[in-house]
């Protein structure tokens, strides 16, 4: 089981704080450091000092780490043009010596688009944009060196793209998709995804989504083991009830609710819950660390949860 640290910097974090978390992620033996890709905070938090750009952050971390994998969970397709995004991620793959993964989604947070003047079309059009971006990015990365890439879609047209730089990873960095796996998203996942993520859902619901993805993978003629499955869950781990109550209060969450809808409890309880997800096929868990200053919790997970998995 791979444990990955997942941060939400839009809720309030500086680059320096994220660098500290990434270094701890590497030093403590976790598999990866991921971050969200948002420009606006959510809920009753100030979000200060303000948003940080996901891919600039990861570029910095690529030069400050040597082992952990790096990526977004997930980047909205509405934020960037697919050609420049393919270039950025390929460059970051070189900067990190092949440690980058691209999480991509259709985009959902209308308020952040309005706040920063980013167009936010209806859901059907966002899915069209999302699908075309996957085609373009995958096509640019897979085009043989020395050949050009062309694409004519409803939203993007590329003519004679040189399709460089090439990523270090061959044929391309892993692509992570996620969501409820409705018919269209399941088909896109079966065509493009290396990993499917279901975030913040109970075990049974997670498994039901995975069943739909497995069926789509089979219909696409792919090998069953060519798709990795993952979950993202808010984490709240402590050795005793007092510590759990303190961490839950810091999150502004009810502890009983966290036990139901997250990874909350003692190390043994959290290891057992991760085991339940493992039974659904999950082989990597994104631990949503809402407080980037709480490195003690990461140390506890590394020392007392990881060995039980």
Regions inferred by a protein language model and the residue ranges of each:
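Active-site-adjacent structural elements that line small-molecule/cofactor binding pockets in enzymes
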Residues: 1-309
């Amino acid at each position: 089981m791979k444990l990955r640290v997942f941060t939400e910097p839009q809720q309030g974090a500086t680059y320096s704080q994220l660098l500290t978390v990434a270094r701890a992620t590497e030093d403590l033996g976790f598999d990866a450091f991921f971050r969200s890709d948002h420009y606006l905070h959510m809920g009753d938090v100030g979000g200060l000092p303000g948003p940080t750009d996901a891919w600039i952050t990861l570029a910095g971390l690529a030069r400050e780490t040597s082992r952990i994998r790096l990526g977004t969970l997930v980047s909205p397709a509405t934020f960037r043009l697919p050609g420049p995004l393919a270039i950025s991620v390929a460059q970051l793959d070189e900067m990190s010596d092949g440690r980058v993964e691209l999480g991509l989604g259709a985009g959902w947070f209308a308020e952040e688009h309005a706040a920063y003047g980013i167009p936010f079309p209806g859901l059907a059009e966002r899915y069209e944009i999302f699908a075309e971006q996957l085609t373009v990015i995958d096509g640019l990365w897979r085009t043989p060196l020395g050949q050009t890439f062309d694409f004519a879609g409803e939203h993007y047209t590329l003519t004679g793209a040189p399709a460089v730089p090439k990523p270090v990873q061959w044929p391309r960095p892993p692509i992570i998709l996620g969501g409820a796996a409705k018919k269209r998203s399941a088909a896109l996942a079966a065509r493009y995804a290396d990993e499917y993520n279901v975030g913040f859902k109970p075990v049974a619901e997670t498994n039901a989504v995975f069943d739909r993805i497995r069926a789509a993978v089979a219909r696409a003629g792919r090998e069953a083991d060519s798709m990795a499955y993952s979950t993202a869950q808010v984490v709240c781990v402590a050795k005793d009830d007092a510590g759990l109550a303190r961490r839950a209060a810091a999150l502004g969450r009810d502890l009983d609710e966290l036990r139901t809808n997250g990874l909350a409890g003692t190390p043994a309880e959290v290891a057992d819950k991760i085991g339940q997800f493992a039974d659904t096929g999950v082989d990597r868990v994104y631990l949503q660390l809402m407080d980037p200053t709480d490195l003690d919790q990461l140390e506890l997970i590394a020392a007392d949860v990881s060995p039980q998995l």
